[in-house]
Amino acid sequence: MTVEITLEKSIIKYGEDIIVLIKRIDSSDEPLSLTIHDESDDSIYAIGVSGDKNIDRVVIPSIDIEQWDCGKYFLRIFGSKYSSSFELIN
C-alpha cells in the first residue's frame, strides 16, 4: 500500500482544526486507519478513513485536541511507511 499524507499546516494553534490530505497512490480501496502519536511514540488519536476515494480530506476538530500538550506530533497510516508531522503551539 502506498499512501501520501499531507497536512494543510505544519504548525497548528490551539483552536484550529487539523486538516489532513490522504492520497492513495496504488488505488487500493481498503479502509485505512490514521493514527496520531506524541513525541514518546504513544498513539493518542485514531480515525478510520473510508476506502472509496483516491484522495480523502480528513478534518480533526479542534475540540478533539484541546487537552493535548504543546509539542510535536506524528501522523501515520497503519501499514504504510510514510508519515507526516506537525507542531501544536499556543
What are these regions (language model features)?
Residues S40-D56:
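Solvent-exposed serine/threonine-rich low-complexity stretches and specific carbohydrate-binding patches
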Residues I18-S27:
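Aromatic/hydrophobic beta-strand junction motif of beta-rich domains
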Residues M1-I19:
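Short, compositionally biased P/S/T/A/G/V-rich stretches that sit at domain boundaries
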Residues D52-V59, D69-R76, S80:
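A glycine-anchored, Pro-Gly-centered beta-turn/N-cap motif
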